[in-house]
């Protein structure tokens, strides 16, 4: 067994303690009517300052079963989040990434947010880029937002022609302005590179 394999096996014991509920001391409840998930205070507190504050609150201390509730997450999403806290690996299905990304922002789990962000950036397409741009604006994630806008600028016709874009514009006028400005900057830069600066007779196409 290599050193890397030994290390993985050693750290895997923490995941086993979660899955087998070894000496758990707090219940984490999802937002829906579903069973709570037993876990360990030490892991929650170590991974998130927000969780640490929740566990230190009088409400949690006086609860007969010592529990905290994460109302934003379903039972399956909560399980994926907790498994990530123990393992550092995200094995959740794609349809959970949005909720986990927002939960990572809300509960200050920066590594989970980074993992979700990288996944979104890697999966950007003309079909999902508007949804991802809207998502990035919720926690004001400039990295994800810039990546989405850059993708839109490079694939402008594919993104803005479908009817979906009209709905997006109505719902997000400020983001639409940012897209237009980014497209203008890109068009001017390309014109300059080709020695044809924009003038009154040469205008970029704006949808």
Curated annotation (Swiss-Prot):
Q: Which GO terms describe its biological process?
A: protein ubiquitination
Matches recorded under InterPro entries: At1g01640-like (IPR044784), BTB/POZ_dom (IPR000210), SKP1/BTB/POZ_sf (IPR011333)
**Database matches in SUPFAM superfamilies:** POZ domain
Q: How does it assemble?
A: Interacts with CUL3A.
- Pathway involvement of the protein, from the record: Protein modification; protein ubiquitination
Write the record's keywords in alphabetical order, separated by commas.
Ubl conjugation pathway
Annotated protein name in UniProt: BTB/POZ domain-containing protein At1g01640
Q: Domain BTB: where? A: 24-94
Organism listed in the record: Arabidopsis thaliana (Mouse-ear cress)
Superkingdom, according to UniProt? Eukaryota
Q: Give the function comment from the record.
A: May act as a substrate-specific adapter of an E3 ubiquitin-protein ligase complex (CUL3-RBX1-BTB) which mediates the ubiquitination and subsequent proteasomal degradation of target proteins.
SMART domains this protein is in?
Answer: BTB
């Amino acid at each position: 067994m290599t050193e890397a394999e030994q290390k993985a096996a050693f750290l895997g014991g923490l995941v086993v303690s979660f899955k087998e509920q070894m000496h758990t001391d707090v219940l984490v409840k999802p937002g829906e009517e579903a069973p709570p998930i037993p876990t360990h205070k030490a892991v929650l507190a170590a991974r998130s300052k927000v969780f640490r504050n929740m566990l230190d609150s009088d409400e949690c201390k006086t609860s007969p079963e010592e529990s905290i509730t994460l109302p934003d997450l379903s039972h399956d999403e909560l399980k994926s989040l907790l498994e990530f806290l123990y393992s550092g690996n995200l094995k959740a299905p794609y349809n959970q990434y949005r909720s986990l990304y927002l939960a990572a922002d809300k509960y200050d789990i920066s590594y989970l947010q980074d993992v979700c962000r990288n996944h979104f950036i890697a999966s950007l397409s003309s079909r999902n880029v508007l949804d991802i741009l809207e998502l990035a604006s919720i926690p004001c994630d400039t990295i994800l937002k810039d990546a989405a806008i850059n993708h839109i600028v490079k694939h402008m016709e594919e993104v803005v022609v479908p009817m979906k874009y009209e709905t997006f514009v109505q719902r997000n006028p400020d983001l639409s302005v940012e897209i237009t400005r980014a497209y203008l900057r890109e068009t001017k830069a390309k014109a300059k590179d080709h020695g044809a600066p924009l003038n009154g007779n040469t205008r970029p196409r704006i949808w």
